């Protein structure tokens, strides 16, 4: 028996899934399982790299996050939005936290324009969605 089978459905008020979904073989089944475990009106907070961010488009196959072999499910803002909306959640807020971090400086921003072998870290490549469960898929 799996651990998640021991947790009753509609049990959690909030589930955090930070940098998990990009490592999941079947992200649709993963979101459906999260839907089962969150109460109606509860919140799913999910963060993952944005594989269609400005750095991914600029650096293409040299985008740093593509080189992690454990990143098997890649999402853009649009594809994650669709996955969430199609599985009983409404997106309350989207956040791109890099722009509010201590790393968002003029010096770091100028590095974006350097012709590096591989993309510099950060630069808006992470997205966090705050989602409200509206529909029970059980």
Regions found by a protein language model. Name each.
Residues 9, 104-107:
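Short secondary-structure transition/capping segments
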Residues 97-103:
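Conserved PLP cofactor-binding pocket of PLP-dependent enzymes
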Residues 1-59, 72-89, 98, 116-117, ...:
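Conserved SAM-binding loop
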Residues 59-68, 106-114:
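Short glycine/proline- and charge-enriched loop/turn segments
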Residues 138:
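ATP/Mg2+ or Mg2+-diphosphate-binding catalytic cores
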